[in-house]
């Protein structure tokens, strides 16, 4: 065709040491490929903090890693299990921080919850 689909993921901060941003971009590319019946070999990550755009090759290895994560998520869903999440300093910059479940599950036991409630009064 006349057009090529190229996903660009905008991030507020700066590049991370882990591959989470690349995995997110890869997952988006995979969804777009299915929706638009096309191949997406490349995408970009734009970081607001550094005002820099980084080219990302959408490789078979990254696609396989995304599929592996999808399978793991589906297994959790089938078991009706929600894994615990550890809050980190990056949680404060997350767009979902006000709706996030880890805050709800911070008290590990009923006893800890009751003690916390009594201490607040």
Describe the residue ranges of each PLM region.
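Conserved catalytic cores of phosphodiester-cleaving nucleases, focusing on short active-site segments
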Residues: 1-15, 27-30, 94
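Catalytic-loop motifs flanking and including active-site residues across diverse enzymes
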Residues: 24
């Amino acid at each position: 065709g006349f057009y090529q689909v190229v996903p660009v993921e905008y991030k507020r901060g700066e590049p991370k040491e882990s591959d989470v941003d690349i995995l997110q971009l890869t997952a988006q590319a995979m969804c777009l490929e299915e929706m638009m019946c096309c191949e997406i070999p490349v995408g970009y990550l734009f970081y607001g903090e550094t005002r820099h755009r980084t080219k990302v090759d959408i490789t078979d290895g990254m696609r396989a890693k995304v599929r592996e994560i999808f399978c793991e998520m589906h297994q959790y869903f089938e078991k009706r299990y929600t894994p615990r999440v550890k809050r980190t300093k990056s949680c404060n910059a997350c767009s979902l921080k006000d709706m996030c479940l880890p805050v709800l599950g911070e008290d590990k036991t009923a006893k800890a919850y009751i003690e916390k409630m009594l201490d607040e009064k």
